[in-house]
Regions:
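Alpha-helix C-capping/helix-to-loop hinge sites
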Residues: 12-15, 34-35, 59, 81-83
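Short, low-complexity N-terminal intrinsically disordered segments enriched in polar/charged residues
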Residues: 1-30, 119-129
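Conserved, charge-rich beta-strand/loop surface module that forms ligand/interface-binding patches
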Residues: 45
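Structural detector for helix-capping/boundary residues
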Residues: 30-31, 103
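A short gly/proline-enriched turn/hairpin at secondary-structure junctions
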Residues: 33-42, 111
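An acidic, carboxylate-rich microenvironment
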Residues: 23, 48-51
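A beta-strand edge to alpha-helix "cap/lid" segment located at domain peripheries
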Residues: 1-4, 50-129
């Protein structure tokens, strides 16, 4: 289970980076919940989470630096680049906690060590709590 959990979250980031939204959606539980405690943003449901990623502004990339996984959960440490092929672009470290059940991602919680205000969202799925 641990290796499959690790593989699942790596597929999540690979599909996101590739903008392969069909593959991305297949990894998600219908009742997925996504939260960002720092900005108090929340998205409920796989369709909302997909829309959140699909409409993220800019040509970004998330490079996975580390994965720690055990049965039913995983953590990734990311180097998030705001411009895919520009090494001079802004970079942020992201720490993402995943919960997994029955081979699907059920909960995602993002932590960003640097303070920031979220960018304007094109997705109507994002609410603040």
């Amino acid at each position: 289970m641990t290796s499959s959990c690790k593989a699942l979250v790596l597929r999540h980031w690979q599909a996101a980076n590739d903008r392969d939204w069909t593959a991305f959606a297949e990894l998600l539980a219908d009742d997925l919940v996504y939260r960002v405690p720092q900005t108090r943003e929340q998205v409920r449901g796989a369709a909302g989470y997909l829309d959140f990623f699909r409409t993220w502004p800019g040509d970004w990339r998330a490079d996975v630096q580390q994965v720690i996984a055990e049965a039913g959960q995983a953590v990734t440490v990311l180097n998030f680049l705001t411009e895919r092929d520009n090494p001079q672009a802004a970079q942020m470290t992201g720490i993402t906690f995943f919960e997994v059940q029955d081979g699907k991602i059920t909960r995602v919680t993002d932590h960003w060590p640097e303070p920031y205000e979220p960018p304007p969202r094109a997705s109507a799925q994002v609410t603040r709590y």
